[in-house]
UniProtKB/Swiss-Prot annotation:
NAD(+) binds at D274, S275, S276, G324, M325, G326. Mycophenolic acid (MPA) is a non-competitive inhibitor that prevents formation of the closed enzyme conformation by binding to the same site as the amobile flap. In contrast, mizoribine monophosphate (MZP) is a competitive inhibitor that induces the closed conformation. MPA is a potent inhibitor of mammalian IMPDHs but a poor inhibitor of the bacterial enzymes. MZP is a more potent inhibitor of bacterial IMPDH. It comes from Mus musculus (Mouse). This is Inosine-5'-monophosphate dehydrogenase 2. IMP binds at S329, D364, G365, G366, G387, S388, Y411, R412, G413, M414, G415, Q441. The modification Phosphotyrosine is found at Y400. PANTHER family: INOSINE-5'-MONOPHOSPHATE DEHYDROGENASE 2, INOSINE-5-MONOPHOSPHATE DEHYDROGENASE RELATED.
Length: 514
């Protein structure tokens, strides 16, 4: 007994594990698989963990998840789904400026609060005009004013119930013959708050609620569908107008200024300067240009992997930094160009520097599972950008196909020859637009179907919350505070430890995550 008994009770606890500073000052470049976080003390449930985190200096998300601006990951469908679940999507720019701006517009109009620029028709318009508007915009609850414009007198409204059973030969009828007349409408006065208007709409059991001024002129409208979205998606990321947040990628060339203008006109909330190596005079000049022309527009710079790179972009005025070079599953930059940095080291080093200036960091690349997300956030990142993890979800662009009985979607790096051949923007990202010989920095592949974002992202959220619970932190802010104070401890993993930490010693198994 004397061999292992020590007097004095349990007041003595030996120092265990490494601080983040000790872990990353060893001189080795570390990936997310090279270390683990040591557990802490639990006195709360996982669903109490607050995942609120900063995307930029002025934009805060309730979920620290961001979809990558890749043409096989984020267009309007993905951006809408990400915003509804508390994150944000960045529309790719491997397309025409007009297409990209229209995708942003779709996101901004998906949920609107007070709609101040609705589709409006006049009594002399015809039924076929309603069907055309429905085909173009996806709805047919349209207010009718005497001139067919906003700001003129409200005379009625057309809903699906008014036109559902009309025969084709009736499509030339005037709307004044079939619309619901003004005297039968429920309206709200101008100056009403959104909360009051929603309550009126709820009581009325109508699909739309027109807002009129003292002269009975239409000034806005709200939709019942938005009430349902508010109920179903309480974490949704919204701007001051109650529209969904949406980001977009642009390049750093002169013609990207035209793209920027269209995006700003469409209502984009934040732009990311999409470059494989962000520490360039081209990006610095573009940051300054955007800040001068659109001072309220948030700008994310990158990509960077060192404090020296980050310094130049912070000095130029960025509102956040995107960190990662060559760590993505489809990226071969490190292999081909011998430049880059292991992602865990890059995230820690840049985050530790950028926090001194209040600049949030987005960890971009190398995310293979929810554990990697938790590790990136514990190393100082405020949000995590995902490509392959979200590819092949229902909301990702592209069609499913089958190979050996497995349902797949195409996924490619923006530095792949495939993407470069599609549009010049991909070449600009890798400074290759003038090269006669293209050097691919990415590959094309396929990813297995993951189902809908509306099921997959809640799984990721729950995983992050459980990770924070095991750490003993009730919020991501507390996780980062524990890391910087040295309270949060880490441990390096040998290759054998990594094998031990995975599934092993089984003849066969099925791995279902959610």
């Amino acid at each position: 007994m004397a061999d292992y008994l020590i007097s004095g009770g349990t007041s003595y606890v030996p120092d265990d594990g490494l601080t983040a500073q000790q872990l990353f000052n060893c001189g080795d470049g570390l990936t997310y698989n090279d270390f683990l976080i040591l557990p802490g003390y639990i006195d709360f449930t996982a669903d109490q963990v607050d995942l609120t985190s900063a995307l930029t200096k002025k934009i805060t998300l309730k979920t620290p998840l961001v979809s990558s601006p890749m043409d096989t990951v984020t267009e309007a469908g993905m951006a809408i789904a990400m915003a509804l679940t508390g994150g944000i999507g960045f529309i790719h720019h491997n397309c025409t400026p007009e297409f990209q701006a229209n995708e942003v517009r779709k996101v901004k109009k998906y949920e609107q609060g007070f709609i101040t620029d609705p589709v409006v028709l006049s009594p002399k318009d015809r039924v076929r005009d309603v069907f055309e508007a429905k085909a173009r915009h996806g709805f047919c609850g349209i207010p009718i004013t005497d001139t067919g414009r906003m700001g003129s007198r409200l005379v009625g409204i057309i809903s699906s119930r008014d036109i559902d059973f009309l025969k084709e030969e009736e499509h030339d009828r005037f709307l004044e013959e079939i619309m619901t007349k003004r005297e039968d409408l429920v309206v709200a006065p101008a100056g009403v708050t959104l909360k009051e208007a929603n309550e009126i709409l709820q009581r009325s059991k109508k699909g739309k609620l027109p807002i009129v001024n003292e002269n009975d002129e239409l000034v806005a409208i709200i939709a019942r569908t938005d009430l349902k979205k508010n109920r179903d998606y309480p974490l949704a990321s919204k701007d001051a107008k109650k529209q969904l947040l949406c980001g977009a990628a642009i390049g750093t060339h002169e013609d990207d200024k035209y793209r920027l203008d269209l995006l700003a006109l469409a209502g984009v909330d934040v732009v990311v300067l999409d470059s494989s190596q962000g520490n360039s005079i081209f990006q610095i000049n573009m940051i300054k240009y955007i800040k001068e022309k659109y001072p309220s527009l948030q700008v994310i710079g990158g990509n960077v992997v060192t404090a020296a790179q980050a310094k130049n972009l912070i000095d130029a005025g960025v509102d956040a930094l995107r960190v990662g070079m060559g760590s993505g599953s489809i990226c071969i930059t490190q292999e081909v160009l011998a430049c880059g940095r292991p992602q865990a080291t890059a995230v820690y080093k840049v985050s530790e520097y950028a926090r001194r200036f209040g600049v949030p960091v987005i960890a971009d690349g190398g995310i293979q599972n929810v554990g990697h997300i938790a590790k990136a956030l514990a190393l100082g990142a405020s949000t995590v950008m995902m490509g392959s993890l979200l590819a092949a979800t229902t909301e990702a662009p592209g069609e499913y196909f089958f190979s050996d009985g497995i349902r797949l979607k195409k996924y490619r790096g923006m530095g792949s020859l495939d993407a470069m051949d599609k549009h010049l923007s991909s070449q600009n990202r890798y400074f290759s637009e003038a090269d006669k010989i293209k050097v691919a920095q990415g590959v094309s592949g396929a990813v297995q179907d993951k189902g809908s974002i509306h099921k997959f992202v809640p799984y990721l959220i729950a995983g992050i919350q459980h990770s924070c619970q095991d750490i003993g932190a009730k919020s991501l802010t507390q996780v980062r505070a524990m890391m910087y104070s040295g309270e949060l401890k880490f441990e390096k993993r040998t290759s054998s430890a990594q094998v031990e930490g995975g599934v092993h010693s089984l003849h066969s198994y099925e791995k279902r995550l959610f």
